[in-house]
Each structure stands twice: as structure tokens, then as C-alpha cells.
A protein has these predicted regions:
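Hydrophobic packing residues in well-ordered alpha-helices of helical domains and bundles
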Residues: 65, 117-121, 170, 258, ...
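Active-site acidic catalytic loop and adjacent metal/ATP-binding pocket
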Residues: 41-47, 53, 85, 174-224
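ATP-binding pocket architecture of kinase catalytic cores
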Residues: 6, 29-143, 150, 157-160
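Short glycine/proline-enriched coil/turn segments at helix->beta-strand junctions
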Residues: 48-51, 77-81, 204, 229-233, ...
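Helix-rich C-terminal or lid/interface subdomains of diverse kinases
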Residues: 40, 214-217, 222-310
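Short, contiguous pre-domain boundary segments
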Residues: 1-3
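An alpha-helical support segment within catalytic cores of ATP-dependent transferases
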Residues: 9-30, 90-94, 114, 123-192, ...
């Protein structure tokens, strides 16, 4: 598996230890394990039993460190655990950007198509929406029309690959989403990257939510994406009923799920098997391709393809 991004910075355990020795020497000799991740923005290492080190892979993710630190300080009252920022490091040792140490959250990442607590996930989304809606716009809290050109390019690109893909079906889903009435209510608090690898399960229950750098306020549709990137036809209605949403918001949420999948699949199909498998699951749930084989669990970080992913 090659690099995901052309401008990706080389990161290894030796670099992480040097950074720790300069910033937090008390942690520098703890066991350090790279995490197999579905994320696309950070390299993530488990540090000892109770910490993780998160290092942006590209300049595009460098601003996430400060943003996520602030967001995580505003999430009191949620029904699940979120990480706590234990330290922030400065550029050093040839590494050019800020980096962070977070607390470790116990749990296994959710996996698309496997049993998932649809009702608890909906309760989390509702609880997040109930928090004060102050802060910057969420990464995906904007109108779908803002990513229309990129989605259409990605659909055309997918038709030129060997991926089983029904472009006509995808365009129909996209047209319905674009045609749905826009959100006219007050902005809502959003995570905006509720990928399975960011949802931690323990004993079959939702225990934690990771990777808050894309969070903010906006149209609540984007936090409906687990209905397609995690759940199936059997559990989607449970999620929809519990989250409580109108037809227009549901259609826009389906549009966000499609947009992410069609852009991620051609970009990551040879470099990130976790994200690629998830995109295939989404497209199958939207009747745009055959049902794929089951994926495996990986802890993720924020999912974005620089300059392409909505």
C-alpha cells in the first residue's frame, strides 16, 4: 500500500519518539504502536496504555490540531466518551506542523454492515445537536451544491475504473439530494465525519466518538451519513425514527453519503483499503453497485482527500 497523498510527510516511530522526548520526555519511552487506520489526515500511534499521538500527514491537516483542541473542550454533556487533549507539540525534528497527544478511548471501531447500535447512534446525534450551536461552520455543514462539480467529476472518473458502478443510479440519487429543499432552520452542532472508524463500540454499545476536527455548525443532514456508511436496510429505519428527521434532510444526508463515497473510492482505492471498502458499502446501500465483502475494523482519523473530498 503506497502513500495516500503526493504531499504526505514521512512519519515513523523514531520521529515520534524524538518529538516526545523534546516535548514530554516522561512519555518518550512508553510503548509506541502505529495504528492501522482508516483515516486520511493523521498518522496515529498508541502511546502506552492510555494515550495516542496524532500527527498531520499533510499541510492541509495542520490547522486541525488547534481546532480539535478547542472543539473537544466544548462537548460536555454528550452520552458517549470523547478524547481529551493531553498535550500539543510544536514543529521540531524536521516535522513541520503542530501535533497532539490525546487520551485513549477503549472500544472497537464499528464496521460497515455488521450489527451496530442504530438507536444509540441516533441518540448521540440528537444530543450533539442540543449543544449550543456556536463555533465555525462544520466541514460538511454547507449546501450540497457546493460540491456538485466535484461529485460529477468523481462519478465520471469511477466509470473509467474497473469498479462495478451504476453511474445512472448514482446521478439519480444525487439529483434527488440536490433537489431537496435546503435547510432553513437554525444551525446545528455537527461532527460531520461520522465514519465507522470514528465510532467506538464496547459490548455492542456506542462507547466513544473520535476525530472532531471537522466538527462545527450547519445543516444537520451530514450527520445522517451513518445510515448508509454503517447501517443496512434492516437498521436504517431504526436510526431514522430515533433521530427524527424530515424527508428533505434525509435526502440531503443520502446525498452527502453518496458524495463522500464517489470521491473517496477513486482517490483511495489503491492506498486505503478501509476507506475504499466503506465507499463500496455506501454505494451498495444506495443501489449503485453490488453488495461488497465485509470489511475489518480500523481506528480512523478524519476522512478527507485534499482538494477533492466534500
Amino acid at each position: 500500500m503506497g502513500r495516500m497523498h503526493a504531499d504526505e510527510h514521512a512519519i515513523d516511530a523514531a520521529l515520534v519518539r524524538r518529538l516526545l522526548r523534546g516535548r514530554s520526555p516522561e512519555w518518550a519511552d512508553l510503548p509506541l504502536t502505529p495504528l492501522a487506520s482508516g483515516g486520511t489526515v493523521n498518522a496515529v500511534y498508541r502511546l502506552g496504555a492510555g494515550l495516542t499521538v496524532r500527527l498531520p500527514l499533510t499541510a492541509g491537516g495542520a490547522g486541525d490540531v488547534a481546532k480539535e483542541r478547542h472543539i473537544l473542550s466544548t462537548l460536555d454533556g454528550l452520552p458517549v466518551a470523547v478524547p481529551v487533549v493531553a498535550a500539543v507539540g510544536e514543529p521540531a525534528e524536521g516535522y513541520p506542523w503542530p501535533w497532539a497527544v490525546h487520551t485513549w478511548l477503549d472500544g472497537e471501531p464499528a464496521v460497515e454492515g455488521r450489527p451496530a447500535p442504530a438507536r444509540e447512534l441516533a441518540e448521540f446525534v440528537v444530543a450533539l445537536r442540543a449543544l449550543p450551536a456556536d463555533g465555525p461552520p462544520a466541514y460538511r455543514g454547507k449546501p450540497l451544491s457546493s460540491v456538485d462539480a466535484g461529485v460529477r467529476r468523481a462519478i465520471a472518473e469511477l466509470t473509467r475504473t474497473d469498479e462495478p458502478f451504476d453511474a445512472e443510479a448514482a446521478l439519480a440519487v444525487w439529483a434527488e439530494a440536490l433537489g431537496a429543499p435546503q435547510w432553513t432552520g437554525p444551525p446545528c452542532r455537527l461532527h460531520s465525519d461520522l465514519m465507522p472508524s470514528n465510532l467506538l463500540l464496547r459490548d455492542g454499545r456506542l462507547a466513544g466518538v473520535l476525530d472532531w476536527a471537522t466538527a462545527g455548525v450547519g445543516d444537520p443532514a451530514c450527520d445522517l451519513i451513518p445510515a448508509w456508511n454503517l447501517l443496512t436496510a434492516a437498521t436504517r429505519p431504526v436510526f431514522r425514527d430515533a433521530v427524527g428527521t424530515d424527508d428533505a434532510t434525509w435526502a440531503r444526508g443520502r446525498g452527502w453519503a453518496l458524495a463522500m463515497a464517489v470521491i473517496q473510492l477513486p482517490y483511495y482505492r489503491h492506498t486505503n483499503p478501509v476507506i475504499s471498502a466503506n465507499a463500496r458499502h455506501v454505494l451498495a446501500q444506495l443501489s449503485c453497485r453490488p453488495v461488497p465483502r465485509a470489511s475489518t475494523a480500523r481506528r480512523g482519523s478524519s476522512v478527507r482527500a485534499p482538494n477533492t473530498t466534500p
